[in-house]
């Protein structure tokens, strides 16, 4: 571990020297590249230097234990105990910082929510989830853009595709992919019976055009008049866009966007969603090829995987991947997801540490 830390610290200092060179300072692209690389190393280097400072403090305190003055020895022992605890804490932090980063963590996110089993109640639950994620994003100061929304006429959602733009959006929301289940008494249930319904959530990192190639000949692009929520026409021009990737083949993907202000905007959004889906497909294929059944220890985010149950009668949310329960269900559905997300990150980090085999060498 410490050999790697030394190499990281050396590269960090090297980048500082490179950015000070006149030929780099005048090359904006290269300067940004070096600055971005240095930012990625900064937390590791800062923590490592704190670790080295703690090591020096321990050595100094140990030397003071040989003093004749009992008060000085007592102070030295106190300092030694403090710095040893600090050293152990910093060492654990360094192990986490050295874990490979998900290259998508800093990206914006595309989310898709669809009603599952349960009819209208499933559509109402899908609407609850959409509101939950929207409120969570707003609490972070992130921007939410709806690409496509299909409602069922009674306030429920059959399908919604939306984008969330914000620093680290994917790192926070990537654990939300899968089947969400709700247990509650529907408003239309006269006998008070508890019904179980589901909704499916897909979470995709936004992908740059340069990250995945899409050939124009593989696309069929249709334009049509956008419809309002519930099927009411709201636009007198053909502003809605449907993009079909490799139509009529097993690889076919259909993306429809109609909530943008113009045909150009809807086309751009549809292409963004298509790139994300193709990227996700490539990632899944790569995982299968290397024999991995999970994209992360807490779950793959596959649509068939039941990840969480929202039990209204017992005011309990259970995340099945980590076997942990959470209370205050109304607050969670109002966007207070922090405790759940933090628990998932902690669990995932611990599992990745266990699998990484990072040692103190």
Swiss-Prot record:
<dbReference type="Pfam" id="PF00472">
    <property type="entry name" value="RF-1"/>
</dbReference>
<dbReference type="InterPro" id="IPR004373">
    <property type="entry name" value="RF-1"/>
</dbReference>
<comment type="similarity">
    <text>Belongs to the prokaryotic/mitochondrial release factor family.</text>
</comment>
<dbReference type="InterPro" id="IPR045853">
    <property type="entry name" value="Pep_chain_release_fac_I_sf"/>
</dbReference>
<dbReference type="GO" id="GO:0016149">
    <property type="term" value="F:translation release factor activity, codon specific"/>
</dbReference>
<keyword id="KW-0963">Cytoplasm</keyword>
<dbReference type="InterPro" id="IPR005139">
    <property type="entry name" value="PCRF"/>
</dbReference>
<dbReference type="Pfam" id="PF03462">
    <property type="entry name" value="PCRF"/>
</dbReference>
<feature type="modified residue" description="N5-methylglutamine">
    <location>
        <position position="232"/>
    </location>
</feature>
<comment type="function">
    <text>Peptide chain release factor 1 directs the termination of translation in response to the peptide chain termination codons UAG and UAA.</text>
</comment>
<dbReference type="InterPro" id="IPR000352">
    <property type="entry name" value="Pep_chain_release_fac_I"/>
</dbReference>
<dbReference type="InterPro" id="IPR050057">
    <property type="entry name" value="Prokaryotic/Mito_RF"/>
</dbReference>
<keyword id="KW-0488">Methylation</keyword>
<keyword id="KW-0648">Protein biosynthesis</keyword>
<protein>
    <recommendedName>
        <fullName>Peptide chain release factor 1</fullName>
    </recommendedName>
</protein>
<dbReference type="GO" id="GO:0005737">
    <property type="term" value="C:cytoplasm"/>
</dbReference>
């Amino acid at each position: 571990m410490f050999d790697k830390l030394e190499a990281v610290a050396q590269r960090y200092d090297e980048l500082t020297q490179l950015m000070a060179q006149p030929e780099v300072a005048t090359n904006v692209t290269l300067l940004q590249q070096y600055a971005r690389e240095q930012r990625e190393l900064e937390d590791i280097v800062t923590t490592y230097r704190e670790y080295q400072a703690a090591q020096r403090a321990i050595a100094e305190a140990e030397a003071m234990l040989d003093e004749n003055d009992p008060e000085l020895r007592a102070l030295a022992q106190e300092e030694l105990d403090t710095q040893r605890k600090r050293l152990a804490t910093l060492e654990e932090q360094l192990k986490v910082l050295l874990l490979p980063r998900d290259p998508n963590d800093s990206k914006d996110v595309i989310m898709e929510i669809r009603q599952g089993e349960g009819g209208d109640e499933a559509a109402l639950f899908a609407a609850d989830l959409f509101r939950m994620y929207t409120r969570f994003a707003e609490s972070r100061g992130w921007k939410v853009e709806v690409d496509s929304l299909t409602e069922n006429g009674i306030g429920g959602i059959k399908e919604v595709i939306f984008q969330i733009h914000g620093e680290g959006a994917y790192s926070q929301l990537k654990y939300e992919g899968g089947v969400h289940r709700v247990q509650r008494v529907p408003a239309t249930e006269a006998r008070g019976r508890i019904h179980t319904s589901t909704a499916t959530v897909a979470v995709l990192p936004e992908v740059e055009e340069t990250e995945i190639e899409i050939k124009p000949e593989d696309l069929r692009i249709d334009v049509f008049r956008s419809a309002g929520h519930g099927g009411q026409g709201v636009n007198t021009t053909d502003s809605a866009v449907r993009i079909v990737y490799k139509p009529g083949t097993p690889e076919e993907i259909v993306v429809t966007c109609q909530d943008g202000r113009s045909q150009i905007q809807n086309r751009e959004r549809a292409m963004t969603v298509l790139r994300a889906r193709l990227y996700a497909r490539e990632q899944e294929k790569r995982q299968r090829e290397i024999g991995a059944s999970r994209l992360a220890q807490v779950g793959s985010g596959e649509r068939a995987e039941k990840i969480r149950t929202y039990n209204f009668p017992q005011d309990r949310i259970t995340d099945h991947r980590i076997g942990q329960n959470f209370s205050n269900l109304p607050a969670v559905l109002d966007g207070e997801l922090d405790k759940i997300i933090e628990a998932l990150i902690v669990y995932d980090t611990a599992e990745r540490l266990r699998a990484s085999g990072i040692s103190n060498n």
